[in-house]
UniProtKB/Swiss-Prot annotation:
InterPro entries reported in the protein's UniProt record: Arginosuc_syn_C, Arginosuc_syn_N, Arginosuc_synth, Arginosuc_synth_CS, Arginosuc_synth_type_1_subfam, AS_cat/multimer_dom_body, Rossmann-like_a/b/a_fold
Organism name: Rhizorhabdus wittichii (strain DSM 6014 / CCUG 31198 / JCM 15750 / NBRC 105917 / EY 4224 / RW1) (Sphingomonas wittichii)
Keyword presence, Ion transport: no
Subunit details: Homotetramer.
Binding site residues for L-aspartate: 122, 126-127
Protein name: Argininosuccinate synthase
Any one Gene Ontology molecular-function term assigned to this protein's record: argininosuccinate synthase activity
Cell compartment(s), UniProt: Cytoplasm
Gene, per the UniProt record: argG
Pathway: Amino-acid biosynthesis; L-arginine biosynthesis; L-arginine from L-ornithine and carbamoyl phosphate: step 2/3
A cellular component annotation (GO) from this entry: cytoplasm
GO biological process, one term: argininosuccinate metabolic process
The reaction(s) this protein catalyses: L-citrulline + L-aspartate + ATP = 2-(N(omega)-L-arginino)succinate + AMP + diphosphate + H(+)
Length: 405
C-alpha cells in the first residue's frame, strides 16, 4: 500500500470521513488532502476544517470550496429542466451533488499531484457508484480508495469505537445519540438509518431539520411568483436572483410552510431497497413551478416525449451516469425543448402543499379563443372533428369487423 503517496479525500467532517482520514494515514502512511464542498450545507464546513487540522492535515492541504452557484446553475437547474423524479417521487438531491464533488476532487488531485482519491460511501449504497463513475469518467487511470470495501469496521458502532480509541470527536444529534446518516446541500437534506430502517415506523418529528411540521405551518396561504427564462428560474416575486440565491429563498418559503417532505422506500442501483427521509423544500416548489410554465409553452408532442424520457433521465442521474454520453444526449434534447419555456408562474403555499394557480408567457400556446365554451367567433370549426374521429377510428372499426364485435 506504500505506493500511494498522496490521496484527496472527500471530507465532510462527519463520523465516516473523520475515521477514514485517520485510517488512510495509518493504513497507507500517506499524505491526506481533504476536500469539503460547500454546496449549501452551512454549519458543517468550519468544523470540518478544524477537525482536519486537529488530525494533522496542514492548511495548504485543506480545501473548502464554495460551489453553491455552480451546483445550482450547472447541475440542479439542468436536472430540473428535465423534470427528473426517480421512481416518480425523489428529486435526486444527493445524486445530483455527486458529479460536481467528483469533478472538483479530480481537479484538486491533479493540482496537488495526488496518486489517488477516496470517499466515505459504504459498499452497500449508491454513492460509491456515483463517485467512482465520476472519477473514472474524468480521470480514467486514477486510483480509487474505498475504505468501506477494504477495512474490517463493519458497522457504525465499530466506527464510533475506532473514533473514541483515536480521540476523534464523534458528532451527536440533539437527542444525545450518534446521528443518523445524513446528507445536506442547497437542494435537500436526507436522513437514513436507525429507526428509519423499519419501513413500518413513522418518521419521528425530531428527524426533520429543514421544514416545520405542516400542521404547525401558518394558517394563511402565501402567494408567490417565479419567473422563468428558457427553462431556468430567474426571479422570485419580480426580484431577479442568481440560481443559488433563488433556491435559497425558495428553501426558506418551503421551510416556513412545511413543504417538500418525502418518506420513500427506493430501489438502490446495487439491488437492495432502502428507506430514506428527504426534505426538499425549495426544490419541491421549483419543480412544480417549472411544470406549470411548461404546460402553456411546450407543444403536446414535445411535452409527452419529455415525460417519456424523464424516468430514464432521472435513472441515469440516480445511478451515477452524469458524465455519460447518453445523459448528455438527453440533456441536449431537453435543453432544446426549453427555448420558449419563458414566463411567470403563480403558486399558493399552504401547510405542506404547493399549488400552481396561474401561469402566463409571451410564448404561450394556450388560446382562450379556441378553447372557450362561449362563442369562439369562428376560431375553431367543430365540424372538423368528425373527419378527425373517423380517421382515428378506422383501424378500430376494421378490427371490430374482423373480430365480429
Amino acid at each position: 500500500m506504500s505506493d500511494v503517496k498522496r490521496v484527496v479525500l472527500a471530507f465532510s467532517g462527519g463520523l465516516d470521513t473523520s475515521v477514514i482520514l485517520k485510517w488512510l494515514q495509518q493504513t497507507y502512511q500517506c499524505e491526506v488532502v481533504t476536500f469539503t464542498a460547500d454546496l449549501g450545507q452551512g454549519e458543517e464546513l468550519e468544523p470540518a476544517r478544524a477537525k482536519a487540522k486537529l488530525m494533522g492535515v496542514p492548511d495548504e492541504h485543506i480545501f473548502i470550496d464554495d460551489l453553491r452557484e455552480e451546483f445550482v446553475k450547472d447541475y440542479v437547474f439542468p436536472m430540473m429542466r428535465g423534470n427528473a423524479l426517480y421512481e416518480g417521487l425523489y428529486l435526486l438531491g444527493t445524486s445530483i451533488a455527486r458529479p460536481l464533488i467528483a469533478k472538483r476532487q479530480i481537479e484538486i488531485a491533479r493540482a496537488v499531484g495526488a496518486d489517488a482519491v477516496s470517499h466515505g460511501a459504504t459498499g452497500k449504497g449508491n454513492d460509491q457508484v456515483r463517485f467512482e463513475l465520476g472519477y473514472y469518467g474524468l480521470a480514467p487511470d486514477i486510483r480509487v480508495i474505498a475504505p468501506w470495501r477494504e477495512w474490517d469496521l463493519t458497522s457504525r458502532t465499530a466506527l464510533i469505537d475506532f473514533a473514541e480509541k483515536h480521540q476523534i470527536p464523534v458528532p451527536k444529534d440533539k437527542r444525545g445519540e450518534s446521528p443518523f446518516s445524513t446528507d445536506a446541500n442547497l437542494l435537500h437534506t436526507s436522513s437514513e438509518g436507525k429507526v428509519l430502517e423499519d419501513p413500518w415506523e413513522e418518521v419521528p418529528d425530531y428527524v426533520y431539520s429543514r421544514t416545520v411540521n405542516p400542521e404547525d405551518a401558518p394558517d394563511q396561504p402565501e402567494i408567490i411568483t417565479i419567473d422563468f427564462e428558457r427553462g431556468d428560474g430567474v426571479a422570485l416575486n419580480g426580484e431577479g436572483m442568481s440560481p443559488a440565491t433563488l433556491l435559497t429563498a425558495l428553501n426558506e418559503l418551503g421551510r416556513k410552510h412545511g413543504i417538500g417532505r418525502l418518506d420513500l422506500v427506493e430501489n438502490r442501483f446495487v439491488g437492495m431497497k432502502s428507506r430514506g427521509m428527504y426534505e426538499t423544500p425549495g426544490g419541491a416548489i421549483y419543480h412544480l413551478a417549472h411544470r406549470g410554465i411548461e404546460q402553456i409553452t411546450l407543444d403536446r408532442g414535445a411535452a409527452h416525449l419529455k415525460d417519456e424520457l424523464a424516468p430514464r433521465y432521472a435513472e441515469l442521474i440516480y445511478n451515477g451516469f452524469w458524465f455519460s454520453p447518453e445523459r448528455e444526449m438527453l440533456q441536449a434534447a431537453i435543453d432544446h425543448s426549453q427555448e420558449k419555456v419563458t414566463g411567470t408562474v403563480r403558486l399558493k403555499l399552504y401547510k405542506g402543499g404547493v399549488h400552481v394557480i396561474g401561469r402566463k408567457s409571451p410564448y404561450t400556446l394556450y388560446s382562450e379563443k379556441v378553447v372557450t365554451f362561449e362563442d369562439d367567433a369562428g376560431a375553431y370549426d367543430q365540424r372538423d372533428a368528425a373527419g378527425f374521429i373517423k380517421l382515428n377510428a378506422l383501424r378500430l372499426r376494421l378490427l371490430g369487423r374482423r373480430d365480429g364485435r
